[in-house]
Each structure stands twice: as structure tokens, then as C-alpha cells.
Amino acid sequence: MKTNQSQTAPAEVRENIMGTMEINPLLLKLSIPMMISMLVQALYNVVDSVFVSHVSESALTAVSLAFSLQNVMIAVGVGTGVGVNALLSKSLGEKNQSRANATAENGIFLSLCSFAVFFVIGLTCMKPYFYAQTSDPVIAQQGIRYLSVCCIFSLGIFTQTMGEKLLAATGRTQLSMISQLVGAVVNIILDPIFIFGYCGQALSGTTGAAVATVIGQFCGAGMTLYFNTRKNPDIQISFKGFRPSAKAIGRIYTVGLPSIAMQCVGSLMTFGMNLILMAFSATAVAVFGVYFKLQSFVFMPIFGLNNGMVPIISYNYGARRPDRVKKTIKLAVCYAEGIMLAGFCIFQFAPRQVLSIFAASDAMLAIGIPAMRIICLHFLLAGVSIVLSSVFQALGNGVFSLIVSVCRQLFVLLPAAWLLAQTGSVNNVWWAFFIAEVVSILMSLAFYARINKTTIAPLYH
């Protein structure tokens, strides 16, 4: 891998924009490209599901059942990247170039290790995974074909995710956005070609959807590699004489592991919800899967906002600028709540229209319309919790994020859903989301009050 040493002045003698630019335009500058990138990322699964829904409802259900393990894969990639992002930004804020470089190099090494793990999972674990959720052999086989391709060829998604985090950590979110767009456009173009059998029956249906997805991911990965080696002078990456550093990896996962665990908790929640809903019907599972695809268009922009927010907070925390830290948090919460309000209005007032994108049958509409209207009530509270979760991570307190996530999804949402399912009405199950969000926001505010007192306030002295 080539280095960037020939480009511009080294980071030690330059002040990064995260320490000098006014907060509001800086947050928008970093976040808007990341928000677009995250929306584009949401397209990967959504586009697959839209085209697959026109094949059959069983194919849509299969892709929905695959989501839990896919989310684990994303969790590992993004969580590792979160650790790299926060530590790299903090190192640059402290003017510690050698630590910044070591963080980047070890992050890339970890992404390759993650690929190796999921390669093995793709070869060995597909059948037990799907048959644990359904006894329908048609749904299971369609899911196996889809998910095995995604896991075995997961090098693309892990490389792309890490590359994007390196760009975001140094303020180059526009380049991250471009790489996402390239991957998504390739996926969108290839999806109908493969899914509907234009390249042969062997690559049709769910198999074709997976092939189109991984090709798009590899294209995005190629772009991030190019941008980081040619257009990112804040880090100098060289694997000549590289040895994995247990200390650097430990620092990365001190921040990133709670993020991984939080998203894996989300996978356990979706897996559990699938089991609860399958007791009603496969159509209920398909509706839940469609909801998760659709809600990603509401939540992903906030995750993008957080990706822009985290390096600002980490950098200014390292530079001992508490005024900039607190202003960043306040602005991020305001923007997040605005996004959530827009999402609430769409789900509340146009559920039939959004469900129709997935070729929803009358049975799906009967379950899906009330589901969308009930579930979206928790959007009004979720914006604050999501932003504060990333604030905890940026300030090195990711364990608080993990505690909130585990309590919300495993100790409140799933038990509430199971109890409500005992009423015999699937419509009652959806209220579990609002109940869980009330608990989540109360815990998040309590933890933030503690962090403000012990971590942010001392920076004023």
C-alpha cells in the first residue's frame, strides 16, 4: 500500500478543521455526506427486498430472516470502524501522528480478520441458522442461497466500511459518500439483471440479489482504498514490517466492542421477534422485515449524523475544548429529532404507499398498515437516545451505550412483545417498541448527566 507522505504538510504541524471551524457548519459539512452515505447503505438491503418481493412473498420472507446475521456482519465492520474513528480522531487532536497511523493499520488488519470469520460462517452455519427460524423448506433454501453468498464474499463490505471510517475520522466525508454512491449504483443496476434471470437461472432470485450486493460492495471498497492511499494526507498507511499491536487493537475494541455488542443485540432482537411473529404467520415476519428495511431510511441519516459528530467530539475532547463538545451534542440532538419527526409523519400518514413498494398483498397490508402506525410512535423519542449513544462512545464510555441497548431490546422489548403476543393479536405486539423506547430515553438521559459531570465539566478547569 502506498503512503501519502508526498502530499501536503504532515498532520503534526497542521490544525485539523475539527478544532477550528464553527460547529454548525462543521457538523453539517461532516454529517451531510455521511447521512447520504448511510442512506445509500440502506439501499443495499432495501433494493434487494424490493426486487425480491416481485419474485415471491417467500423470497421476501427469506431475505427478512437473513437480516439478523447480516446485521451481525455489519455490526462487526461498523463497530470496529467506530473504535478506529474515535481513536484516530483523538490521536490527531493530540497531534500524535504515530498512534494515528498505527490505529489505521491495525483497523485494516482487523477488517481482514473479520472477513475470515464470516467466510467460515458462510460455509458452515447457513442451514442451522435458517431452519431454526422456519420449517418451510422453500423459504429456508432461498435464504441459504442469499446469505451464504453475502458471508463468503464479505471482504468487500468489511474493506469498504473500514475505508469509510478512515476517511470520516479525518473529515473527508465527501470521499466516503462517493465510495458509497459507486457501490449503491452498481448494486441497483445489477439487481434486476441478476434477480430476474437475465444472466442465467443459476444467478436468479435471492442468489442474484446477493451477487449484485457483493459486487457493489467490492466496487465501493475499491474506491475507499484509492481515496485513503491517494487523497488522505492525515494518515500514512504502510504495511512494510507491520505487526499487529495488541495495545492498539485493545484501544480500538475498548471503544468499538460496545458498538458491536449493541448492534448484535439488535440482531438477537430481530431473531427473537421473527420467532414471536412466525407463531402468527410468515406474512407477519415479512411485514416486520419490510418495516426494518423502511425504518432504515429514517434511522440511517441519524447514524450518518453521528458519524460526523463523533470525530468532532473526540477531537475536541482530546484538545480539551468542552464548549465545542457540548455545542456539537446540542445541535446533533436537534437535527436528529427533526429527522425523526419527518419519518414519523411518513409512517403515520402514508403506510399503504410505502408498503406498496414491496408488492404488498392484501394480507400484508392488513397487518402492515396498523404495524407502521403503531411502531412509528417511538420515533419521537428515539432521536435523543441514538445521539447520546454515540456521545458515550466518542467520550470513551461505550459501555453505557451497551447497557442501554441491552436493556431496551433484550430486557424490555422482547419480553413485552412476547407478553403482548399472548393476547392473540399481532397488532398488540407492535406496542413493545414504544414501551422499550421510553425506558431507553430515561436511561440515556441519566447516563449523560453522569458523563457531563465526570468527563465534560472537568475540561473547563
Question: What are these model-derived regions, one by one?
Answer:
Residues 1-31, 88-155, 201-257, 313-378, ...:
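Short alpha-helical transmembrane segments in multi-pass integral membrane proteins
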Residues 20, 24-43, 47, 69-76, ...:
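Residue-level signal for short hydrophobic patches within transmembrane helices
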Residues 29-48, 149, 160, 183, ...:
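Transmembrane helical elements of multi-pass membrane transporters/channels
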Residues 39, 43-61, 130-137, 193-204, ...:
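Helix-terminus/linker motif at the lipid-water interface of multi-pass membrane proteins
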Residues 60-120, 157-176, 287-351, 382-404:
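Small-residue-rich hydrophobic transmembrane alpha-helices
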Residues 72-75, 119, 187-192, 221-225, ...:
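Hydrophobic transmembrane alpha-helices of multi-pass small-molecule transporters
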Residues 81, 150-168, 176-184, 209-224, ...:
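Short runs within selected transmembrane alpha-helices of multi-pass transporters and secretion channels
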Residues 122, 165, 191, 195, ...:
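Structural signal for membrane-spanning alpha-helices in multi-pass inner-membrane proteins
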